[in-house]
Amino acid sequence: MSPTQEQLTALGGVFLAAVLVDRIAKTGQTNEAGLSCMLGSLLVRDPKDTLDVYGGDDINLREGYRALIGALERDPSTLQREPLRYALSMLGLERQLAKRDDMLDVIGKRLPQIQSQVEHFGPAHENVIAACGALYQDTLSTLRQRIQVHGDMRNLQQPSNASKIRALLLAGIRSARLWRQLGGHRWQLVVSRRKLLKELYPLMRSE
């Protein structure tokens, strides 16, 4: 994997979280495999490469890659507008989080507790989702910038859906942080679209 593909893998995680949030908000449906992949990504320590954070297989990220390709190609027929908005908002929130050592400290201390729950219940268990959602609510949701999620109010008002959305936003922002640590910058999404697409298409084909 090239350094750019390492970045795109992490960015695929941001977009996967965004796609899953949009689906829950609009339909109330959850992709359990995607949810498990993203919640699991919060807890990976010492991965051998970026893909290892997401279970070691590009197929886990294919919905995120698809949304990212749609955003980079700027084709109205494939552009997923709400997921793109959520993804860009997560990239923005990560920048705010990076300036808050106190918040990073809280997240760093609580993730090992969530890891213990995962070992006991599994990654997509309601207790784990609730704990991740609560961590988002106690930290990132207090920042000045907020992510407004649009969808069917009946879905958004269900406590289990609200927890899943918050947990996915937490995981998406973790992926945004990883993308940044790998050298990702927002200007690349505008200036280097063709280069990114050239590196991204093979990741989709590796399904």
Curated annotation (Swiss-Prot):
The keyword Cytoplasm applies. It is a peripheral membrane protein. Keywords: Cell inner membrane, Cell membrane, Cytoplasm, Membrane. Pfam families: DUF489. It comes from the Bacteria. GO terms for cellular component: cytoplasm; plasma membrane. The keyword Cell inner membrane applies. It is found in: Cytoplasm; Cell inner membrane. NCBIfam families: PRK00218.1-2, PRK00218.1-3. Belongs to the HflD family. This is High frequency lysogenization protein HflD homolog. It comes from Pseudomonas fluorescens (strain Pf0-1).
